[in-house]
From Swiss-Prot:
Phosphotyrosine modification, residue list: 175, 235
UniProt-annotated stretches for the region Interaction with PLCG1: 136-139
Protein name, entry field: Linker for activation of T-cells family member 1
Tissues and organs where the protein is expressed, per its UniProt entry: Expressed in T-cells and mast cells.
BP terms from Gene Ontology: adaptive immune response; calcium-mediated signaling; cell surface receptor protein tyrosine kinase signaling pathway; cellular defense response; gene expression; homeostasis of number of cells; immune response; inflammatory response
Source organism: Mus musculus (Mouse)
Transmembrane parts of this sequence: 5-28
Annotated spans, Interaction with GRB2, GRAP2 and PIK3R1: 175-178, 195-198
Job of this protein: Required for TCR (T-cell antigen receptor)- and pre-TCR-mediated signaling, both in mature T-cells and during their development. Involved in FCGR3 (low affinity immunoglobulin gamma Fc region receptor III)-mediated signaling in natural killer cells and FCER1 (high affinity immunoglobulin epsilon receptor)-mediated signaling in mast cells.
Lipidation (S-palmitoyl cysteine): 27, 30
Keyword Lipoprotein: yes
Keywords: Adaptive immunity, Cell membrane, Immunity, Lipoprotein, Mast cell degranulation, Membrane, Palmitate, Phosphoprotein, Signal-anchor, Transmembrane, Transmembrane helix, Ubl conjugation
Signal sequence range: none
Subunit structure: When phosphorylated, interacts directly with the PIK3R1 subunit of phosphoinositide 3-kinase and the SH2 domains of GRB2, GRAP, GRAP2, PLCG1 and PLCG2. Interacts indirectly with CBL, SOS, VAV, and LCP2. Interacts with SHB and SKAP2. Interacts with FCGR1A. Interacts with CLNK. Interacts with GRB2, PLCG1 and THEMIS upon TCR activation in thymocytes. Interacts with THEMIS2.
């Protein structure tokens, strides 16, 4: 009868104090040993016989390099530089440079004395415009004949003396062969027989007279060559006319 009277509720009430004391003991134990619990847990996970070593990382060592000693000197003072005159520039479209960069450019710049190519090109263009104002060349038509000086060719005689005398009479009226006389000898430079200006007092020698005189000289020269066997000079002044 007593065994039937014990129910699950009674059994629970009997076991309740035992469970409470067990939980209290566990809580106190946990509070007192937190570090030891962690160490024991890690040891339980990894047995002592097996040791895991971390991988060793080898870093290559660079050899020690000896650098030379560097001695610092105070900066040298630059000599005073004179400002270089520059051409004025328009203010409207001018591009301002920083002051530091402009000073460095002034210090390093050197005056150049070279001819500018664009200026030469402009001069050539101005000359072309002056020569051809409209830009076109003036071409003459084929119908208009070109003005070419016509030189009349005189017949060349067989005798060189006659040719020279005729040429002097026809082309050059100022200089003619003058027969030998005292006036011509005095008018020449050193008394030699040369071409001299004809004075207005002397009468001009006609062609017929010159031709006759030259033919006589040629005949005389031929006779002298037959007798003496020597060559006479190619050119001689005319003899005095009577």
């Amino acid at each position: 009868m007593e065994a039937d009277a014990l129910s699950p509720v009674g059994l629970g009430l009997l076991l309740l104090p035992f469970l409470v004391t067990l939980l209290a003991a566990l809580c106190v134990r946990c509070r007192e040993l937190p570090v030891s619990y962690d160490s024991t847990s890690t040891e339980s996970l990894y047995p002592r016989s097996i040791l895991i070593k971390p991988p060793q990382i080898t870093v290559p060592r660079t050899p020690a390099v000896s650098y030379p000693l560097v001695t610092s000197f105070p900066p040298l003072r630059q000599p005073d530089l004179l400002p270089i005159p520059r051409s004025p520039q328009p203010l409207g479209g001018s591009h301002r440079m920083p002051s530091s960069q402009q000073n460095s450019d002034d210090a390093n710049s050197v005056a150049s004395y070279e001819n500018q190519e664009p200026a030469c090109k402009n001069v050539d263009a101005d000359e072309d415009e002056d020569d051809y104002p409209n830009g076109y060349l003036v071409v003459l038509p084929d119908s208009s004949p070109a003005a070419v000086p016509v030189v009349s060719s005189a017949p060349v005689p067989s005798n060189p003396d006659l040719g020279d005398s005729a040429f002097s009479v026809e082309s050059c009226e100022d200089y003619v062969n003058v027969p030998e006389s005292e006036e011509s000898a005095e008018a020449s430079l050193d008394g030699s027989r040369e071409y001299v200006n004809v004075s207005p007092e002397q009468q001009p020698v006609t062609r017929a007279e010159l031709a006759s005189v030259n033919s006589q000289e040629v005949e005389d020269e031929g006779e002298e060559e037959g007798v003496d066997g020597e060559e006479a000079p190619d050119y001689e002044n005319l003899q005095e006319l009577n």
